[in-house]
Amino acid sequence: MSQLIFNQPSEDKSALEDAGDFTPRFDDRGLITAIVTDAGDGELLMVAHMNAQALALTIQTGTAHYFSRSRGKLWKKGETSGNLQTVKEIRTDCDQDAIWLKVEVAGHDATCHTGRRSCFYRTITLQDGKPMLDIVDDELHFDPQDVYGK
């Protein structure tokens, strides 16, 4: 499979906003933000980043790939845990500088490395004048120790 090549974005704003060529606007590190939701119920699952290779692989294979900023490498989401993300729809915003993936999650139906369905399992509240985190989704779909050995 040959890698997709993305053309440079147009300087013409209307070309970015209309139908036609998909010309993603990667940041100065070569990344684009990816928002990921469940294709069935719309729950926000995660926010990640993609480089051109990850975006191309995602489009070509229908399986979500990302670029790990902390590890500095490409990663196929769910490759270790079995919680692969099958992409049902990809959208971009008006500036083509963010991607929205609607996915179905295989395996344990978990997206977060903590074993939860979503990476957004905590709320931020103000307690005694201090911002604090409260867990609102404590249901583990898998044990990270068993899957990752951590």
UniProtKB/Swiss-Prot annotation:
Compartment annotation: Cytoplasm
Catalytic reaction annotation: 1-(5-phospho-beta-D-ribosyl)-5'-AMP + H2O = 1-(5-phospho-beta-D-ribosyl)-5-[(5-phospho-beta-D-ribosylamino)methylideneamino]imidazole-4-carboxamide
GO CC terms: cytoplasm
Any one Gene Ontology molecular-function term assigned to this protein's record: phosphoribosyl-AMP cyclohydrolase activity
Domain of life: Bacteria
Details of cofactor binding: Binds 1 Mg(2+) ion per subunit. Binds 1 zinc ion per subunit.
EC number: 3.5.4.19
Family per similarity comment: Belongs to the PRA-CH family.
Name of protein: Phosphoribosyl-AMP cyclohydrolase
Species per Swiss-Prot/TrEMBL record: Rhizobium johnstonii (strain DSM 114642 / LMG 32736 / 3841)
Encoding gene, per UniProt annotation: hisI
